Structures are given as structure tokens and as C-alpha cells.
């Protein structure tokens, strides 16, 4: 959903668009709630309130002021991520395909021959980091840039087994044009760029679990963040390999050598960060042309000092000369050294060339060892070739993708590697490594152990659900970690599958009820974005690869109506009820009937079930931005801080009724996941509320009327407003509550319109308009620890006779209350009050 705020209506009609006119009779929160439950994707919001826009954005729903037709057209035609704190819009708009254009935000790609392999007549455009070079295209009242690129296609091609780039590109563009936008992945970079600066500013020690290549630039500015990944491939792991020969396989049609070099250097930077927690100087030998340096500098400021007889245009200091062993003393501490020296073959015979390469490998290693043997805080990444060679058993081997699989690979060495044991590795083993292993991640740090860390802030985005982790250990970590942002795969299956397939692995699935948390928010990606100054125009698909975002230890937990709130809670219900349902009242009718309340007169205004809880359960796949458990818990302890909107405090029994309705809905839909979720939420309600039932009551509250429009043969026809189980010394407490509620009780507009047999030999009249007052009275008694109400549904009725009678129907008739009293069952009246 996107909300576009306009001062004036527009003549143009847009598909999937609805107009909402601000309702001045309601406050900003109520207007926001009504907007959030509209069913179209685009909402044109007229006569808007800035506060309402802010409320929507904090809820993760993109809401933007629009000042011109051009702005409206730009935003209505595509999806976007909105940085509402800084008023920046990041479009995810691929309409540039109509210019026969693909886009990249990586400069090095523009310096390759990729243009030769594009679709006929197409071009490649560099748009800068997150599309910032496109800002000049939009002369808008807000900052705007198009963050859409085709880097995902290019990178996927590089790691694929396909060689024909044009066919690959064509297929992927067609896929993009025929499938829903993966909005979470596209906006994730914007999210990370907001998330980590805010966390690092607050917490001294931050742990990040499971970063992948798409985050390789994000963390360059955060050397103190401790990364955990899948670990490095080290020399001693080669013992499992069988010897092979040179393969000579082409990986990419266009030259990706620069990409390989960039990955090598970035891998080395993060390896250095994990050891020394600071930024290094970057020395590079054999550096030309290294156009990728420009990409790194777009994200973070590094000093690059380079040596090469050819130009290296983006380095900080360039020495247009060769680097020799004797020059190692020029290199300072607190640095990394990237050795990529390789003489051009030219017309050299391959045997002679092989000797040169092997000698050069030895020379490279000698430079590396000398560099690491003195000084402090140093890491080296060195180019090697497949040959009989001794290497430290702890050296980290790299084989990032390059244009052709030949004889080349790389090793990362630190100051401890050069003093450890070395192992002789035959050439054939190195070929086996090169032929079969591709380094897929620039983060090669050790795996994370699933243990809470009291002093650290843990971020684990899309990293812990894999089934090689113990599911219970993941739950324990989340329950015990005081400060964290952790995601787990949401169970949105219909058969309550404990794990689901994802690519070539399996993920554990989770529901919010799997966790026992306090002061924590469990929400969706959208809900999480709102907490970090962002909103989004498109929610994740309800049956997609969705995750629960669990935020432990933040200052937003008690701001119930501001973050992870009830915005959009009824949206899916509205979509169903006003399109394919038997009636738009279907939800109300089902909730009453499933709790054996057969009086459906006015069911849409006097319902016996919490619609919030019911919708949050049966449509949780659509509205899990709403943190239901938090909502229940804060109500149970009486700490609901509400800024605005229509607030209705539910009685705990209403929540129980909602769970029972949801359970029956799940049975009818054969939805085993909702069935379990409803059961567990009911269990949670009973855990946080101290609900007691007067199933064996000894007192009741009765309402006597001035007159009854039916024949009756009981002595005094009355409405039982509820039963109690109390000791005699609690009568005073009950009377005190009744006196406090006196005005509201006598204002209750009770009406009747028919009679029926409640059960064998009990003839009653219906009573409408009672439930709201009943639940308020229930809450008053609950807060005063007085047992009121039974476990079964309260059905308001007036007993007329204890014999079988025919049903009578009349026009709805208002009943005037004569008195309200407290009476002992089969005993005397102990309190009576009149208006």
C-alpha cells in the first residue's frame, strides 16, 4: 500500500486506486487506521494531515506528500522505499527498460566488454550507489533516486553455470516483468544503511551474523562490528581433495577479473576488521587498472597506495613503477597488502611461461612473508598458482569467480600464519581446489555459536533459520538475548510444516508463540522498517519467503499505537468481505455463531468477539506487522499508552472468544498452522491474564425493567447481567463497582425483538445492546479481582417462562431499566439501585 497525499483532486483515473478524504470528525490516528484498511494499492489522500502521514510511515506504510502531477505519476507507477526521516524516496522502477537500457551501481562493470553481450541495441548505464546519480532526473519537492539496477542479474550470472549472457539476461528480464517485485530484497540495502549507523551509535559492541556479498559495501564503514559467517576454507581442508588437472573453463563471456580483485580485497578488509577493529591502509602491487576502487570509495573512505607501471586512476597514491622485495620496508603497520603481480605472457612458450609464473608465485610469497614478519596489525592477500608448494596449514584460500578457471587462486595470510606449521601441497590438489570450489562470500569469519551475549547487540538477518542450527538453540538465543534484531523464517504454511525448502537447504519455521519474550517486539519487515525511519509501498507476499523480525531491548516497546501497531489489521478481511464473501457481515456472523451466540441482530455493532485478535490470527500471513502478543501483554498489565484514535479496552474473555472463533475458522479452512497459533495464543492469554470463572456461581446481577412487551409467567422477568462467585465479605467490593458503573449501566440502550427457547423449558426474550456494557463491567470486576462471568459465552436474555412457548416476533422495542440489583442465587437481594 502507498498513500499519496494531495491538496487537490486529480482528473486522471488510475487503476487499483482509491480516494480518501480526511475526516475532520475523527482524529489523526483514526484517519490513519481507516486509510490503512482500504483495499486498493494506491490511496490518494485529500485534505491530508501531516500527523496522519507520520503515523502511517511509523507503521511502515509509505505515505508521501505530493506537490505536482509529475511527482504523482512517478510514485503511482512503481514501488519505493521511503526514508521519511530525511524525506528521500528510493524508487524500485524498472521502466528504464523502455529506453533499451540496463543499469548498474558498480562502476567496474562499465569498464568491461559487457556491452558486447547485451540485447541488440541496448546500453549499460552507471547510476551510482543506490542510484544516487539519478537524482538529477527528478526535480521534486522530496529527494528522489531510482535504486533499481540489474546488478542482481549480472552477479547471479557470474555465479551460475551458464555462459551465454545475452540469453541469461533476456530470461531474467522476462522473469522480472512477470513476477511480483521482491521488495524486501530491493529495499534491504536502504534498510541496512539506516539500521547499522543507528545501532553503532547506541551500542559499543555489535555482532552481525551471516552477512552475504550483498552486504559487502554496507559494513566498510563499521570496522568495530564483529562479523560471523560460515568460516574460511583453509589449507588443511585440502586434505580431503583428490588430485586433478588443469581445467581451463570459461566462467563469463565478459571480463570479470576486476570483480575478482575487488572481492579479494574486500574479503581481506573484513578479515582485518575482525582481527583489529579499525580501518587499514590498503597497499596493492600489480594494481592497474582497478576501476573497482571507485566503487569502494563510493561507500567508504580508504587510502589506496598502489604500484604498477600502468595507471591506476582511482588510487590515493600511485607509484608508476614495479615493486620489489627490497621495497617491503616502505609499507607501514595497520595495513593490508594485496599482491596481484603477474607478468604478461605475450608470445612466451607455455613451458617457459609456466616457469616464470611459478617463480613469480615464490617471489610473491616471499614479499608476503617479509611484510608479515615485522611490525603489527597486518594482513596479506597474495596471488598464487597451482604448483607444488608449502603453505601454512591455517592460510585462508580464496577462489572468487574470475573470467576463466585456470591455475590462479589466492591466499590470505596473517601474522600468526607465518609462524604456524606448513604443509606440502601437490599441484594436483590445488587444481582440485580451483576446479571445484568457488568462494561465494567475502565474509569468511567463523560461524556464530548460538549463545546469548549480555553486553553485545546481535543482528542476525536471514541467518539463523537454516536447519543446520538447532531450532531450540535459536529459540533460546532469542529468549535470552537482551539486545538484538534477529529474523526467523515465518511459518506461513497451511499444514504447520516445521521446516520448508529454500533453494538447496531447509529452513526451520516459527510462529510468534514459539518465543517467551518481554520488552520485545515481533513484527514483519514493514513493521521493522517503521521503527528505523523507513516505510515501504509494497508488503511481502503472504505466502512468500517471509520472516519474523524480533527486536529485543528498544525504547519503542510501550509505544503500542506507534510501532508494530494495528494499522491494516482488517485490510485482508475487507478484501474478502467486500468481494467474494456471502455478505460483508460474514466475519461478524461467523464470530458470533462459532461461539454459540445466535442473536445476530446488530452483530456488526455489537459483536461478542475481539475482531482485532480474530483478524490477527486468521489472517496473520497478511498482517503480522501487528505484534499480537505484545498487544495482549500490555493490556494484561494495564500499560497501554495510546496517543489517539478510538480506543476500546477488550475484556480478556473477548480475546478468548476470538481464539475459539479462529480455531473453528482454521478447521473449516484445513489450516493447521492457524489452528495451532490460535490454541497457543489462547494459552498465552490465560498465562498473562488471571482469568477465573464463576461456573458454579452464588450471586448474580439482575436488571429489572419497567415493562416487558411479552407475556410471561415468572414472578419478575429480568436480565441477568452476569453471575459471580464471591464470598460474603466481597459484597461491598461488588457494590462499589456497581455504583461506579451506575451512570453507564442506566444509559445502556437495551432492546428486544423476539422470543425463543434457550433450552428445554426455558423460554426467553433476546436482549440487544448489552454486550459492550457487560464487557466494561467484566473489566472492572477483573481489575478488582472479583470472579465474574462463566467460561461459556455470555448470551444476554430475559427469562419469561419455565415452560415451552412459541416464538414471538415484534418490532424492536427499547426497554426502560427500572432497577439494577445484586442477589444471592436462591437467596435474598443484597443490593438494589434505581436511576
Swiss-Prot record:
| Family annotation (InterPro entries) | VP3_Rotav (IPR011181)
- Region described as 2'-5'-phosphodiesterase activity: 693-835
Give any Gene Ontology cellular component: viral nucleocapsid
Q: Which GO terms describe its biological process?
A: symbiont-mediated suppression of host innate immune response; viral process
| Molecular-function GO terms, alphabetical | GTP binding; hydrolase activity; mRNA 5'-cap (guanine-N7-)-methyltransferase activity; mRNA guanylyltransferase activity; RNA binding
What EC number(s) does the entry state?
Answer: 3.1.4.-, 2.7.7.50, 2.1.1.56
Q: Name one Pfam family in it.
A: Rotavirus_VP3
Its recorded reaction(s) are:
a 5'-end diphospho-ribonucleoside in mRNA + GTP + H(+) = a 5'-end (5'-triphosphoguanosine)-ribonucleoside in mRNA + diphosphate; a 5'-end (5'-triphosphoguanosine)-ribonucleoside in mRNA + S-adenosyl-L-methionine = a 5'-end (N(7)-methyl 5'-triphosphoguanosine)-ribonucleoside in mRNA + S-adenosyl-L-homocysteine; 5'-triphosphoadenylyl-(2'->5')-adenylyl-(2'->5')-adenosine + 2 H2O = 2 AMP + ATP + 2 H(+)
Give the highest taxon in the source lineage: Viruses
Region annotation 2'-O-methyltransferase activity: where it falls in the sequence = 246-428
Region labeled N7-methyltransferase activity — which residues?
171-245, 429-555
Name the UniProt key words of this record, in alphabetical order: GTP-binding, Host-virus interaction, Hydrolase, Inhibition of host innate immune response by virus, Methyltransferase, mRNA capping, mRNA processing, Multifunctional enzyme, Nucleotide-binding, Nucleotidyltransferase, RNA-binding, S-adenosyl-L-methionine, Transferase, Viral immunoevasion, Virion
Q: Does the keyword Repressor apply?
A: no
Q: Where in the cell is it found?
A: Virion
**Domain writeup:** Contains a bipartite N7-methyltransferase domain, a 2'-O-methyltransferase domain and a GTase/RTPase domain. The C-terminus contains a phosphodiesterase domain that degrades the 5'-triphosphorylated, 2'-5' linked adenylate oligomers produced by the host cell in response to IFN stimulation.
Its family remark reads: Belongs to the rotavirus VP3 family.
HAMAP family in the cross-refs: Rota_VP3 (MF_04124), Rota_VP3_A (MF_04128)
What name has this protein been given in UniProt?
Answer: Protein VP3
Amino acid at each position: 500500500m502507498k498513500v499519496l497525499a494531495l491538496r487537490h483532486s486529480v482528473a486522471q483515473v488510475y487503476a487499483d486506486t482509491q480516494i480518501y478524504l480526511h475526516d475532520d470528525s475523527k482524529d489523526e490516528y483514526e484517519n490513519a487506521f481507516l486509510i490503512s484498511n482500504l483495499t486498493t494499492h494506491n490511496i490518494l489522500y485529500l485534505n491530508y494531515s501531516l500527523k496522519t502521514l507520520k503515523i502511517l510511515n511509523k507503521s511502515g506504510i509509505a505515505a508521501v506528500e505530493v506537490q505536482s502531477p509529475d511527482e504523482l505519476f512517478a510514485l503511482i507507477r512503481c514501488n519505493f522505499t521511503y526514508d521519511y526521516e530525511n524525506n528521500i524516496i528510493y524508487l524500485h522502477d524498472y521502466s528504464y527498460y523502455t529506453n533499451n537500457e540496463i543499469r548498474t551501481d558498480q562502476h567496474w562493470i562499465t569498464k568491461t566488454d559487457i556491452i558486447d553481450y547485451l540485447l541488440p541495441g541496448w546500453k549499460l548505464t552507471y547510476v551510482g550507489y543506490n542510484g544516487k546519480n539519478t537524482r538529477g532526473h527528478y526535480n521534486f519537492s522530496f529527494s528522489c533516486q531510482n535504486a533499481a539496477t540489474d546488478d542482481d542479474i549480472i552477479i547471479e550470472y557470474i555465479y551460475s553455470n551458464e555462459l551465454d549472457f545475452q540469453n541469461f539476461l533476456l530470461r531474467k528480464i522476462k522473469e522480472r516483468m512477470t513476477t511480483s517485485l521482491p521488495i524486501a530484497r530491493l529495499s534491504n540495502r536502504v534498510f541496512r544503511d539506516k539500521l547499522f549507523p543507528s545501532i553503532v551509535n547506541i551500542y559499543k559492541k555489535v555482532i552481525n551474523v551471516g552477512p552475504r556479498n550483498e552486504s559487502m559495501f554496507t559494513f566498510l564503514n563499521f570496522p568495530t562490528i564483529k562479523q560471523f559467517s560460515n568460516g574460511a576454507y583453509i589449507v588443511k581442508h585440502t586434505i580431503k581433495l583428490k588430485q586433478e588437472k588443469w581445467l581451463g573453463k570459461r566462467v563469463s563471456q565478459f571480463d570479470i577479473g576486476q570483480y575478482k580483485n575487488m572481492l579479494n580485497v574486500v574479503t581481506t578488509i573484513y578479515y582485518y576488521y575482525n582481527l583489529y577493529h579499525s580501518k587499514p591502509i590498503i597497499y596493492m602491487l600489480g594494481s592497474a587498472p582497478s576501476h573497482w576502487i571507485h566503487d569502494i570509495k563510493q561507500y567508504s573512505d580508504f587510502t589506496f597506495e598502489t604500484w604498477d607501471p600502468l595507471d591506476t586512476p582511482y588510487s590515493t597514491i600511485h607509484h608508476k613503477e614495479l615493486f620489489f622485495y627490497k621495497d617491503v620496508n616502505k609499507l607501514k603497520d595497520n595495513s593490508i597488502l594485496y599482491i596481484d603481480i603477474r607478468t604478461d605472457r605475450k608470445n612466451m612458450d607455455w613451458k617457459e611461461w609456466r616457469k616464470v609464473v611459478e617463480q613469480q608465485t615464490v617471489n610473491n610469497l616471499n614479499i608476503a612473508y617479509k611484510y608479515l614478519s615485522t611490525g603489527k596489525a597486518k594482513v596479506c592477500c597474495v596471488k598464487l598458482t597451482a604448483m607444488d608448494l608449502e603453505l601454512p596449514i591455517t592460510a585462508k584460500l580464496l577462489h572468487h569467480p574470475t573470467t576463466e578457471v585456470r591455475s590462479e587462486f589466492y591466499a590470505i595470510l596473517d601474522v600468526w600464519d607465518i609462524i604456524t606449521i606448513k604443509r606440502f601441497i601437490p599441484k594436483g590438489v590445488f587444481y582440485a581446489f580451483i576446479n571445484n570450489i568457488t568462494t561465494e562470500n567475502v565474509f569468511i569469519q567463523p560461524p556464530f555459536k548460538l549463545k546469548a551475549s549480555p553486553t553485545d547487540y546481535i543482528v542476525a538477518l536471514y541467518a539463523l533459520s537454516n536447519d543446520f542450527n538447532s531450532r531450540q538453540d535459536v529459540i533460546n538465543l532469542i529468549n535470552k538475548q537482551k539486545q538484538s534484531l534477529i529474523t526467523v523464517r515465518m511459518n506461513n504454511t497451511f499444514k504447520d510444516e516445521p521446516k520448508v525448502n529454500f533453494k538447496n537447504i531447509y529452513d526451520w519455521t516459527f510462529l510468534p508463540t514459539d518465543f517467551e519474550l518481554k520488552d520485545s517486539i515481533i513484527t514483519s519487515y514493514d513493521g521493522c522498517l517503521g521503527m528505523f525511519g523507513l516505510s515501504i509501498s509494497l508488503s511481502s507476499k503472504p505466502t512468500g519467503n517471509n520472516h519474523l523480525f524480533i527486536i529485543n531491548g528498544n525504547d519503542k516497546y510501550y509505544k503500542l499505537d506507534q510501532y508494530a501497531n494495528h494499522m491494516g489489521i482488517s485490510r485482508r478481511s475487507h478484501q474478502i468481505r467486500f468481494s467474494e464473501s456471502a455478505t460483508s457481515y460474514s466475519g461478524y456472523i461467523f464470530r458470533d455463531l462459532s461461539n454459540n451466540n445466535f442473536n445476530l441482530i446488530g452483530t456488526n455493532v455489537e459483536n461478542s468477539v475481539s475482531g482485532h485478535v480474530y483478524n490477527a490470527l486468521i489472517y496473520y500471513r497478511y498482517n503480522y506487522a501487528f505484534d499480537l502478543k505484545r498487544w495482549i501483554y500490555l493490556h494484561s498489565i494495564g500499560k497501554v499508552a495510546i496517543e489517539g484514535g478510538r480506543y476500546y479496552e477488550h475484556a480478556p474473555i473477548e480475546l478468548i472468544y476470538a481464539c475459539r472463533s479462529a480455531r473453528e475458522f482454521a478447521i473449516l479452512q484445513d489450516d493447521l498452522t492457524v489452528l495451532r497459533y490460535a490454541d497457543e495464543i489462547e494459552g498465552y492469554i490465560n498465562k498473562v491474564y488471571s482469568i477465573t470463572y464463576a461456573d458454579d456461581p452464588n450471586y448474580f446481577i439482575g436488571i429489572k425493567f419497567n415493562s416487558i412487551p411479552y407475556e410471561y409467567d415468572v414472578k419478575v422477568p429480568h436480565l441477568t447481567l452476569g453471575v459471580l462467585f464471591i464470598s460474603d465479605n466481597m459484597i461491598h467490593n461488588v457494590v462499589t463497582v456497581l455504583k461506579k458503573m451506575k451512570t453507564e449501566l442506566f444509559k445502556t440502550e437495551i432492546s428486544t425483538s423476539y422470543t425463543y427457547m434457550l433450552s428445554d423449558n426455558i423460554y426467553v426474550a433476546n436482549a440487544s445492546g448489552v454486550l459492550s456494557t457487560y464487557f466494561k463491567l467484566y473489566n472492572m470486576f477483573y481489575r478488582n479481582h472479583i470472579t465474574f462471568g462463566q467460561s461459556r459465552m455470555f448470551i444476554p436474555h430475559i427469562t419469561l417462562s419455565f415452560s415451552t412457548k412459541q416464538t414471538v416476533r415484534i418490532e424492536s422495542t427499547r426497554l426502560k431499566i427500572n432497577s439494577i440489583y445484586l442477589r444471592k442465587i436462591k437467596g435474598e437481594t443484597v443490593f438494589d439501585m434505581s436511576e
